[in-house]
């Protein structure tokens, strides 16, 4: 039994794992398949992470993973398909978390941290994948500085699109807001 199972191996999951290991806890990180460390792996140049100026997002994610590996964090390379909280004893707040994986194996822990992350809603336009990280971006705050003094377009239909367009209007020469 683990003290903590962390589902997701992006920056949040690996950070949680590092802190848990430093606290001498028995921790495992479950990841469906290793494709870099979350969304950051798809970022081009990352220039806003302290201590690593102008690093490629994939390389920065690799440094996160190397840090976790150096502390002997255990990785479970399987997809978590079911999570169940099971009563453990008489106290209502005392539970054990059972995580079932895609190969029907089960791991148990006293605590569970879910950091599976998010994926951007892509537009599906030609060239989008080819230019991701090379002009196509999904985070105005993360990547806005790359467009300083340039013309930019924000594609979206909700509050985030408007917030991003307003944020970029202080950085960019001109900003177009394209409503989906």
Task: Identify the meaning behind each predicted range.
Residues 1-2, 6-32, 132, 138-180:
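Rossmann-like dinucleotide/flavin-binding elements
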Residues 1-7, 23, 35, 42, ...:
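FAD-binding core/adjacent interface of flavoenzyme oxidoreductases
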Residues 17-18, 41-42, 124-127, 165-167:
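Short amphipathic alpha-helical segments
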Residues 58-75:
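Helical element adjacent to the flavin cofactor pocket in flavoenzyme catalytic cores
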Residues 33-57:
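Conserved N-terminal glycine-rich FAD pyrophosphate-binding loop of Rossmann-like flavoproteins
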